[in-house]
UniProtKB/Swiss-Prot annotation:
This is 4-diphosphocytidyl-2-C-methyl-D-erythritol kinase. It comes from the Bacteria. Keywords: ATP-binding, Isoprene biosynthesis, Kinase, Nucleotide-binding, Transferase. The lineage of its organism: Bacteria, Pseudomonadati, Chlamydiota, Chlamydiia, Chlamydiales. PANTHER family: 4-DIPHOSPHOCYTIDYL-2-C-METHYL-D-ERYTHRITOL KINASE, CHLOROPLASTIC (PTHR43527:SF2).
Amino acid sequence: MDLFSPAKLNLFLKLHGKTSHGFHEMTTQYQVIDFGDNLYLESSNEDSLVCNLPELNTPQNLIWKSLQVFRDYTQIRSPVAWRLHKRIPIGAGVGGGSSNAATALYALNEHFQTQLPNSVLQELGKKIGMDVPLFFSSGSAIGVGCGEKILPYKDCKREERFVLYFSDQGVLTKDAFSYVRSEDFSQREENISLYKKENDLEKSVFRFRRDLEEKKQMLKKMWSPFHAHVCMSGAGATLFVSYPRKLEIDPSIAKAIHATIQNSQGVLVNSLRKHSGWFPCPDNLFATTR
């Protein structure tokens, strides 16, 4: 079984305070995108995991946690072999590890024909990581609580395109949250549409990653002719640009946009939704422009 394991963006992320357990409460808009990894699953004589990034061939890989959670719930112990082809950078803030974990849960459910509904898979996903339940939604959702409570959201941003800018150095989630100050918190809004397209974690991350702050300012200047918006996803280190798809109707503007993407080494992506089953695999995962 070969499944696409997509990345996600946080189109906005607002922090509201801390829980009694020390976790940060938030409201965030998630969007799954057509860029990601591939995960292969097959029966085997013993459990194994092989990844094209050797540093992920460890017991700490969340795929192993998914397998354990699935086994605890179903009592199925048959050994399986995994192969993971990574494209999503480590520590990028676009849900690479969480997506792999969710994809693994879905794959196990299909492989062993256990017919667990999405509601159960979401609950199992919460035991693995805060972002994992997202991937059992349609791909467009609002996250509340600590981000793990998923609410459906129809606005899938098909009228926008996104350009990803990865960093050579990732950001650890624990570091991003450790620099948060009380003045970084935002008030809750009654209507989701009232939230500005901002990521409150930028304030904390930029305190120890000035290079990302400088990169954001550079991207804002570069993309200003196209009325584009620049934001950090999750805890970083990925920055992304969003711009109106309708701009590409004009051939000259479309040409200028694609030249900007190529010159800045961005990765052009689109929103991705599923209507049933799992997320479809895009035709071309390697091109920087499509």
